Structure formats: structure tokens, C-alpha cells
């Protein structure tokens, strides 16, 4: 139990008080320094007066710094919420994902009250599950139960697995025959309903028996029946099948429920020596109520962890030391500019203490990983501190949200603040990324936002790209009226049109070549649109609606642009190709500063396009071809600056190998924009065909057409890292 915080400071003895200790140490130190010259303790002695005021201030600061850490993570209008700081409860961190047959069994039993038993089988050769269920005797249409099972399965489906058959199980009906006595005052109808519910619950796959593999026997059942409220004793008690008493009960056993008085002929209830009667309608009503409430009470519940709450303290105002000094020193504590050197000395004390309190005040927002706190204004120091805290969270959860290879190319100009936001977004989702990394796309809910395989979400969150499956990357450049030109893949006519913009190296006089300086551009979205429109008007190469892959990729680096002064006192904005020789004339003019600004705008424009063109697709062939279980096809674009680099591809491959479940194999394909356009079309058609049983052959054809596009991939890697 937390200690009760009293609304006052506990009084200490004079010897234990911090102020007394500080003052004693100060005076001893001053006396040692002064030697034979000593003070008379008058106000005109600034040393002693200052020590008293400063020690009082230090005592107050010590009090303000003495609260439990959790209190400093509470704000006046916001309580302590561990998730805000990336401190997730154990049930989220260590909660098990749905993997085994028992996991699915628990899931269905806790989610569907209309079933009492079920059998789940898994075929490793096809990756298919089969479910047979026993429904309760009271409610539930079979078709609705089948639909619920399929819905719940697909919400929790793992990669390269699928649900095949869902059907009603063949059951063995048992009949209850008994003669027993109840206590006086008990309602016989209610007691009989309790007895039937006890038998039903024992025969069902309740949460406690899912993984226990216990054999159901008459002995165990009778022990439970004797504990039923209202039952005094049993004279006879049998579960009968075809007139034969049963000693063991199979998993598919179900209990016959009486619906009319004739069904109760083999059940006799006594109260004392008097035979009592049963109200059959009331019996059915009570048994139905017990069934519903019993399933609810026995559904799996996760224990709640008691969390500390913390308490906010109004401790952030600092009372200047100068206010405690005599007026004869003529100090100005409320003025920013000190009146004297002594005043400046006092200001320094106050600055240190005030700055410390301000750092404590911003602590909740500094350590927060919530999106709502993204408006926090960062400095160079707070960025360093925040990164240190995020590094701590990385180690806590065993991930790396800031791999070194991701920083090598600055992620298209990602600012330190943007890098923090990317890391925070990744860490906000760390529990589900770790726990559910095998989780697949829900093929029944294709239009639902956020419905993506977990390995895609992990990859995209880590490198900072859009994880939405509806983001069509092959449409990005056409949307901007641009055609990407890869020299080795287009006609000689197009190449000649591009080459007409090139200038040979020998025409570049080094004395006339200048670097392009960095220009600060507007961050306003409307201003950016206007800048891009103006850029397209002023740079002639946009008139062709063509862009070389070299310029598209390497134009993201400002050092590849140059300003060249021509003979007629004009300037040309030049781009130096990296992937083949030559310079490209992007535009010209008499004002060098305008060309520099255009180069900066073009670089930012290309960075945004590159970033927008990056994604990852996950294909599960087994959903179209049952002969290919445990196989994944992972597809990425090959035409962006980062995704075109060999080192970046290798690091992405290592990352994917680390997050893809170990039992799965497959390949990673890096494909061109042209191939991606057809691939995305086939991919979305394939998704829509998964749930249509009449399109079995069509699904295989779509998968084949999709793999034809992958056969010509620029680079292929394997997910199998066993070598």
C-alpha cells in the first residue's frame, strides 16, 4: 500500500535539518578561508547573508527534488499513464499470441457463447485448419456460428495459414437419469437446472480444460454434482447412452435437455420423503440463464495489475534569492540585466535553480512517446536526452528503432525531430509488433484501414514509410505527370530526347562551376504546392514529362547540382549524372539565386517522391495454391534512392529475416516501376479472390501472372538465413 502523503513537510530535529547542516559547513569553510579575519554577522557582510539566503534556497530545492520519480511524470491535468512513456503493462508485453491449436480453442470458446465443444485440426502439408463444433442446446443457428468462427479466425490468422472446413461435429447424446434428495426450502426446479448446468459445463471444453487433456469420467462428474447447491444426496445417478450407463465421456458428448414433462420420467426428486414436481418451462428458463451467465463468468479474464498513480506538486515557481537579501545591496531580482557584479552573481544562483525546475517541469513531455505530445519544442540537448530514453526503451523491448544503416543516407533529409517521431511511432506499437509478428492480413476485411501483415507494419514503421496496402506506389509518378526513364529499358528515341539535354564534361570550365548553397524553404503545404508549380514552369526539362532514374534517385543530394556561368553572363543549373556520364542542363537564367532556390525545391520534391514510392508487399501463395505452405513472397520497389542501393537492400533483407517467423521460407524481390505497375494490379485482384471459393483456378492463374512480373526482378534475395 502506498504511503499516505501528508500535506505538510515533516519537521526534522535541528541537527538533522538540511539547512542547519549546510549553514554549519558554509561557516566552517568561510572561517577556514578567512583565517584571523572574521565576520560580525551584520547585514553589510554579504558573504554570510548570501550563504543564509542561498542555503534556504538549496533547502527548498532539495524538498522539491525529493518526491518519488513517478510524481514528476504527472501533470496538473494529466495523471500518470505508463503507456504514455512506453511503459506497457505485463499483459501487453508478455501476452501470448494465437499460435497453437489450444490457443485457437480458447479463443473460440471465449468469443462464441453458442458453442460448448470444438475440435481443431491442422494439416501441415497445406497450412489448413479444420474446425468441428458442438453448439449449445439453447440457441445459435449453425450458419451464424460458422460465420462467427470464420470471422474470428481471419481476425487472428497467422501467415501462410488458412481455414478450410467449419462444420457441426457428430455428437453422442447422453441422457441424465437420477433419483436424488434436496434440502428443505430449496426450489426443486432451480436445483435441477443447476444439476443440468453442472453436467453441461463438465462435458464442455471450458477454459480450464482446454490444455489439461483430462479424461472425463463419471467419478469426476459425480464429485462435482454432490457440490451443487441445494443437493443433499444422490440415491442413483447415471449418464445413459442407448440405455447403458457410461463411465467415460468422449469429447463430442452432449446432454439431452428435457423440453416436456415426459422427458423427466427418469428423474425423481425428493424433499425428505416427499416426491416433488418440476415446472418444465421454468426449468428451461433457469437452465438457459445459468448457461449464459456461467459462460460469461468462466470466460478468460486477464488479471489487472495495480498501477501507481503519482501526485502532482506545484513546485515549479522559483523565489529569487535576491528577495531575501537586505535592501542595502540594491539588487534587482525582477530585472533581466544585473545592476552590479554582485547582482549578476546572485542571478547565476537563481538561473541554475530555475533551470533545474524547468527541466523537471518538461520531464513528462520529454519522456512521452504519445503523438499528442509531438508539439513539444525540442532543442539540441533535449533531442539528445530523448534519444537516450528511446535507446533505453529499445533495450527494454529488444528492438532497434534507430539502426545505424538507416542514418547513412539521412532518410531523404529527415530532421532530428522527424527521426524522433519515427522512433516514437515504432515504439508505440512495439508490444503488438513483438507479440503478433506472425499475424497475417484479414482477407475478410480488405477495406479496413490498418489491415496489413504485421511484418509489413514492423518494416514500414521502422524505416518511416506508409504501411497502408492501398498506397499504390506505381501511381506516384504518373500522378505527377512524370515518366521514369531507365536507360537500358527504353527505346532509343526516348533516350535521344533525354541525351539532348546532356552536356559533355569538356564543355564544363571549372572556373565557372559553383556549388549550390542550401536554401531554407517554406514548410507550409500551400506554399510548397506553389513552389512546385513555379519550379515546373521554370525548369524546361519538365516540359518533356520525362525524368531519368539517375536524376530521380540522385537528385535527392544537393551536392549533385551545380551553377555554371556561361559566356553570355547567364547561369545554368546543371545536374551531374552518377549512373552514366554527362551533365544535364535543367534550366538557365540571369539570377543565380533563383536557380539555387530551384535546385533546393527540386531536391525536396524528389525526396518526397522517392519516399512516397517506397512500400512492401507480402504475398502468401498458399491462399491460391494449397501445395505451397510456409512460403512468402516479399516484394519491394527497386527504383528509389534508398531501395536501389545494394547495402540498403542487404540490411532490409537482414531486418526481414529477423522479423519473419523462423518456420517460413521465401524470397524477396526488388522490381522495377514498370513491373510494379502490373504486379500491384494482379496483387489486389488476388486479394479480392481469396474468399471466393468459385475462383480456385482463377486464383492460381492470378498467382502465376503475378510471379511472371517477379521473374524479371532486378534483385532477388532469399529469406532463408540458415547459411
Language-model segments: residues:
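Single conserved position on a long alpha-helix in the C-terminal lobe of the eukaryotic protein kinase
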Residues: 30-41, 46-89, 176
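Secondary-structure transition/turn motif
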Residues: 133-137, 250-251, 574-580
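Membrane-proximal bilayer-interacting regions
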Residues: 177, 194, 201-266, 270
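A short, exposed loop/beta-hairpin motif centered on an aromatic-Gly-Thr core
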Residues: 530-542, 578-597
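Short aromatic-glycine-(Arg/Gly/Cys) micro-motifs in beta-strand/loop hairpins
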Residues: 561-583
Amino acid at each position: 500500500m502506498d504511503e499516505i502523503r501528508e500535506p505538510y513537510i515533516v519537521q526534522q530535529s535541528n541537527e538533522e535539518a538540511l539547512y542547519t547542516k549546510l549553514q554549519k559547513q558554509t561557516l566552517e569553510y568561510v572561517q577556514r578561508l578567512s583565517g584571523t579575519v572574521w565576520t560580525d554577522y551584520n547585514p553589510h557582510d554579504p558573504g554570510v547573508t548570501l550563504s543564509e539566503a542561498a542555503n534556504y534556497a538549496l533547502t527548498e530545492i532539495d524538498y522539491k527534488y525529493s518526491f518519488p520519480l513517478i510524481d514528476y511524470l504527472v501533470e496538473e491535468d494529466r495523471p500518470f499513464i505508463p503507456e504514455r512513456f512506453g511503459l506497457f503493462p505485463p499483459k501487453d508485453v508478455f501476452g501470448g499470441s494465437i499460435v497453437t491449436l489450444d490457443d485457437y480453442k480458447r479463443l473460440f470458446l471465449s468469443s462464441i457463447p453458442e458453442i460448448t465443444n470444438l475440435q481443431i485440426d491442422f494439416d501441415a502439408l497445406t497450412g489448413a485448419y479444420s474446425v468441428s463444433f458442438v453448439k449449445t442446446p439453447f440457441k445459435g443457428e449453425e450458419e451464424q456460428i460458422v460465420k462467427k468462427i470464420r470471422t474470428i479466425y481471419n481476425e487472428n490468422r497467422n501467415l501462410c495459414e488458412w481455414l478450410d472446413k467449419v462444420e457441426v461435429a457428430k455428437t453422442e447424446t447422453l441422457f441424465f437419469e437420477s433419483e436424488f434428495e434436496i434440502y428443505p426450502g430449496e426450489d426443486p426446479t432451480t436445483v435441477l437446472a443447476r444439476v443440468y448446468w453442472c453436467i453441461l459445463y463438465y462435458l464442455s471444453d471450458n477454459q480450464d480444460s482446454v490444455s489439461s487433456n483430462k479424461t472425463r469420467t463419471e467419478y469426476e462428474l459425480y464429485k462435482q454434482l454432490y457440490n451443487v447447491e441445494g443437493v443433499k444426496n444422490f440415491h442413483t445417478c447415471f449418464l445413459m447412452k442407448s440405455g447403458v450407463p457410461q463411465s467415460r465421456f468422449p469429447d463430442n458428448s452432449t446432454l439431452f435437455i428435457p423440453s416436456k414433462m415426459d422427458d423427466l420420467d427418469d428423474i425423481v426428486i425428493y424433499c425428505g420423503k416427499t416426491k416433488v414436481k418440476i415446472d418444465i418451462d421454468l426449468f428451461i428458463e433457469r437452465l438457459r440463464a445459468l448457461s449464459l451467465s456461467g459462460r460469461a463468468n468462466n470466460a478468460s479474464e486477464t488479471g489487472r495489475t495495480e498501477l501507481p498513480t503519482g501526485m502532482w506538486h506545484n513546485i515549479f515557481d522559483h523565489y529569487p534569492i535576491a528577495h531575501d537579501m537586505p535592501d542595502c545591496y540594491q539588487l534587482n531580482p525582477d530585472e533581466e540585466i544585473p545592476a552590479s557584479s554582485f547582482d549578476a552573481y546572485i542571478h547565476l544562483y537563481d538561473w541554475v535553480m530555475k533551470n533545474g525546475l524547468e527541466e523537471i517541469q518538461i520531464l513528462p513531455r520529454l519522456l512521452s512517446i504519445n503523438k499528442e505530445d509531438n508539439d513539444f519544442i525540442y532543442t539540441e540537448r533535449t533531442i539528445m536526452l530523448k534519444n537516450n530514453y528511446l535507446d533505453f526503451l529499445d533495450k527494454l523491448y529488444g528492438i532497434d528503432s534507430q539502426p545505424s544503416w538507416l542514418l547513412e543516407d539521412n532518410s531523404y533529409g529527415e530532421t532530428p525531430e522527424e527521426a524522433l517521431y519515427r522512433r516514437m511511432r515504432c515504439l508505440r506499437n512495439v508490444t503488438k509488433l513483438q507479440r503478433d509478428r506472425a499475424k497475417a492480413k484479414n482477407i475478410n476485411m480488405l477495406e479496413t484501414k490498418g489491415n496489413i501483415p504485421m511484418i509489413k507494419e514492423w518494416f514500414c514503421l521502422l524505416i518511416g514509410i506508409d504501411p497502408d496496402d492501398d498506397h499504390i506506389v506505381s501511381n506516384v509518378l504518373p500522378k505527377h505527370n512524370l515518366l521514369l526513364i531507365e536507360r537500358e529499358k527504353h527505346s532509343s528515341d526516348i533516350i535521344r530526347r533525354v541525351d539532348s539535354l546532356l552536356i559533355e564534361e569538356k564543355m564544363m570550365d571549372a572556373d565557372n562551376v559553383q556549388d549550390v548553397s542550401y536554401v531554407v524553404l517554406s514548410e507550409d503545404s500551400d506554399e510548397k504546392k506553389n513552389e512546385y508549380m513555379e519550379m515546373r514552369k521554370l525548369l524546361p526539362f519538365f516540359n518533356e514529362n520525362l525524368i531519368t532514374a539517375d536524376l530521380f534517385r540522385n537528385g535527392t543530394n544537393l551536392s549533385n547540382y551545380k551553377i555554371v556561368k556561361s559566356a553570355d553572363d547567364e547561369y545554368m543549373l546543371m545536374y551531374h549524372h552518377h549512373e552514366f556520364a554527362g551533365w544535364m542542363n535543367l534550366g538557365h537564367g540571369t539570377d543565380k539565386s533563383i536557380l539555387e532556390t530551384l535546385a533546393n525545391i527540386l531536391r525536396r520534391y524528389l525526396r518526397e517522391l522517392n519516399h512516397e514510392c517506397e512500400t512492401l508487399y507480402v504475398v502468401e501463395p498458399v491462399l491460391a495454391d494449397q501445395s505451397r505452405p510456409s512460403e512468402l513472397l516479399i516484394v519491394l520497389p527497386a527504383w528509389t534512392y534508398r531501395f536501389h542501393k545494394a547495402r540498403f537492400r542487404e540490411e532490409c533483407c537482414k531486418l526481414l529475416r529477423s522479423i519473419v517467423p523462423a518456420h517460413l521460407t521465401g524470397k524477396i524481390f526488388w522490381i522495377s516501376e514498370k513491373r510494379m505497375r502490373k504486379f500491384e494490379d494482379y496483387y489486389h485482384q488476388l486479394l479480392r479472390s481469396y474468399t471466393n471459393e468459385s475462383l480456385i483456378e482463377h486464383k492460381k492463374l492470378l498467382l502465376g501472372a503475378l510471379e511472371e512480373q517477379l521473374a524479371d526482378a532486378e534483385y532477388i534475395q532469399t529469406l532463408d538465413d540458415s547459411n
